[in-house]
């Protein structure tokens, strides 16, 4: 019987070779290339900092891997601009449905030096994860929405969770049957302010993790709607190189009965 090769993952798993600050990761299998793709906010940690300008003006970085252990930086996504100038893209979320990739990304005009600017959710589609077509703004009834998580909760039934900063930074939900038109349901997780929700299934349960700036909050559910708080994770430094401080804004990839958590920290 052929034995599968165990891969020892490096720590850190990936470092952005331009700014060395990849954040808000999302990982998806590229069906066409048979490779793992990592998309992330290419935070400009080494740039001149005027207020919070270094958090803005970010592009979406791309890295690829055949085995999930060794990652190659491939650059940034092109063709996302919807207006002139240097603008801000945060926290990509990508889902594949009926042969089409859908990306939901947080967007801010320009490079603000403070937090007091509108934030929108933009929707793009692609056949190959490189060439993206703008499908429109996602109307969520708020001008300060970021950090999308999209999951198919039933056959052609999709749910979107996101951070609504106009509503106390609570995790809010919307539903859709086609990934283009969304109906807002309202706030869904209200025990604390948080961002970067991520939903997955494992061990017969529905799970949500979110970043509440003291580690990752963990919730479980039977129906993708009513969430029970569990013990936090990544709320202290790890033992591996550069694994310092709390874990932030994570993505989860489920393979069989195992889940792999991708997160970033501030070493």
Listing of model-derived features with the role each one plays in the protein:
Residues 1-267:
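Carbohydrate-active catalytic/glycan-binding domains of CAZyme proteins
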């Amino acid at each position: 019987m052929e034995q599968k090769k165990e891969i020892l993952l490096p720590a850190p798993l990936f470092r952005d070779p331009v700014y060395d600050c990849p954040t808000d990761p999302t990982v998806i299998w590229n069906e066409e290339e048979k490779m793992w793709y990592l998309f992330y906010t290419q935070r400009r940690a080494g740039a001149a900092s005027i207020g919070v300008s270094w958090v803005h003006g970010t592009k979406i970085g791309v890295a690829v891997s055949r085995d999930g252990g060794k990652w190659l930086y491939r650059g940034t996504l092109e063709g996302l601009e919807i207006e002139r100038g240097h603008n801000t893209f945060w926290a990509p979320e990508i889902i594949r449905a009926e042969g089409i990739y859908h990306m939901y990304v947080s967007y801010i005009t320009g490079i603000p030096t403070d937090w007091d600017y509108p934030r929108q959710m933009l929707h793009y589609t692609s056949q190959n994860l490189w060439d993206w077509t703008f499908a429109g703004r996602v109307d969520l009834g708020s001008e300060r929405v970021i950090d999308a998580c999209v999951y198919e909760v039933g056959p052609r039934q999709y749910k979107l969770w996101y951070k609504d900063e106009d509503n106390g930074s609570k995790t809010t939900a919307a539903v859709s049957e086609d990934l283009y038109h969304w109906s807002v349901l309202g706030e869904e997780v209200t025990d604390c302010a948080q961002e970067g929700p991520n939903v997955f299934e494992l061990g017969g349960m529905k799970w949500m993790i979110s970043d509440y700036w003291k580690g990752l909050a963990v919730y479980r559910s039977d129906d993708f709607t009513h969430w029970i708080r569990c013990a936090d994770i990544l709320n202290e430094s790890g033992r591996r190189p550069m694994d310092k401080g709390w874990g932030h804004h994570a993505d989860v990839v489920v393979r069989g009965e195992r889940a792999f958590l991708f997160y970033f920290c501030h070493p």
